[in-house]
Amino acid sequence: LARHREAICRLCRREGQKLFLKGLRCFTEKCAIEKRNFVPGQHGQSRRAKKLAGYGLQLREKQKVKRTYGLLERQFRNYVEKSERAQGPTGENLIVMLERRLDNVVWRSGLASSRSQGRQLVLHGHVRVNGKKVNIPSYLVSPSEEISLKEKMHQNAMVLEARNVAQSQSTVPWLEIDRDNFKARVVALPKRENVQTPPITEQLIVELYSK
């Protein structure tokens, strides 16, 4: 994921909801949202929540999605522009494209505990697509492609822990996951209705960039 100078858990608190950036910690009582569900800062606990509207609401939605997928502004704008040129609703195109990123698919497959960890696995050359090394986190997967971890990583403690936790999570309809062999096959393109966490109102982002 793109580097953020701000502490990861503060990003979730800023958005007021879990973005699942911290991996396994997000599923425990140690999660910052569970412990301190108020905006970060010296007066965060006593500060009244502002009711956002218009531009403020659009901006917050954009920031939430950027942080969820770990993107910088230039990268995110590029995805928006590509989504505008593609057939179909721009907002849906955007979310589907982000879901197809290889680092996200590694996470969705339960091979990593977070998108950030998935990105590191990709960058370090541990991920294979159809048996060939791909070290580009932004690589967009397509139906029939198989994503796997190289055998050396099958006994990695972080990978094993991520796999065990993923077994209790909901399935991903567009992925056929083989946890025993540390791989997954893309059986279809992701659909917008399959992406539920965090809640995203992508039309607000489309409106923001259309100005």
Regions found by a protein language model. Give the residues of each.
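Internal active-site segments that recognize and position negatively charged phosphoryl groups
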Residues: 108, 112-117
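Short, intrinsically disordered, mixed-charge
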Residues: 108, 123-124
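Ferredoxin-like alpha/beta domains used as RNA- or RNAP-binding modules
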Residues: 1-109, 135-211
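Residue-level marker of beta-strand positions
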Residues: 120, 126, 144-146
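Glycine- and Gly-Pro-enriched alpha-helical subdomains that act as flexible
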Residues: 125-129, 133-135
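Short, well-ordered loop/turn sites that connect or cap secondary structure elements
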Residues: 115, 121-122, 141
